[in-house]
Amino acid sequence: MISISIRNDISCLIYFSKPIRSILQDYNSGIEIVGDYRISKKWYIAAELGNEEFTTNEDFTNSTSKGSYLKAGVNYNSYNNWLDMNNEIFIGFRYGFATFEQTLNSYQINTGNTILPPVFNNSPSTQKGLTAHWSELQLGFRAEVYNNIFITFSGSYKVMVNISDPRNFKTHYAPGFNRIYNSNTGFGFNYTISYLIPFAKK
């Protein structure tokens, strides 16, 4: 994950969570660019732009979602820093939008008959042009653990507003939102190790 951050100076933050997760999980790959801009002492404009591919394996289906997403909103930093510290305890709100395609890789027809063998279909079927809209509440903290090295932990609660499903199949995963359940709500957790690269003072 790569982040551009503008506060008291122009700087760049590089996050390492998504590339590492892509290496450890062969069913998940993606990249995310995150930026924020301070508009007052406590308030930041924030956005995340990413691309993700995720394969979901259910009892009778295997499907892959692939696409891009944008999340935009604000962060409020409730922490009072001393001197030139840049730590944060923040709460944030995001509006999220994703455009993606979903491929039904394979599925098993459940006949409900224990005598007949199960019926499998391994012919992939892809539908493009799917979209998703959601809102997101974030809570987290960012702390400088060494000179220009930060660690961030955050959690999010997401509510799906609208999503388009493929014909004759339900979307199980939307890029940027994660897994989709019957309640159309979900939780997310993010952790990052970042390095701050200052470019120039204002």
Model-predicted regions and their roles:
Residues 23-78, 83:
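Glycine- and aromatic-enriched membrane insertion/assembly motifs of diderm outer-membrane
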Residues 16-20, 49-55, 76-78, 95-101, ...:
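Transmembrane beta-strands of outer-membrane beta-barrel pores
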Residues 11, 71, 75, 183-202:
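Outer-membrane beta-barrel "beta-signal"
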Residues 8, 27-31, 66-70, 87, ...:
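Residues that define the transmembrane beta-barrel architecture of outer-membrane proteins
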Residues 1-8, 42, 80-88, 145-151, ...:
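Short loop/turn motifs that connect adjacent beta-strands in outer-membrane beta-barrel proteins
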Residues 22, 50, 54-67, 100-111, ...:
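Extracellular/periplasm-exposed beta-strand and loop segments of Gram-negative cell-envelope proteins
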Residues 12-14, 35, 47, 72-74, ...:
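Membrane-embedded beta-strand positions of outer-membrane beta-barrel proteins
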Residues 1-38, 48, 194-202:
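Short glycine/proline- and aromatic-enriched beta-strand/turn motifs that initiate or cap beta-hairpins
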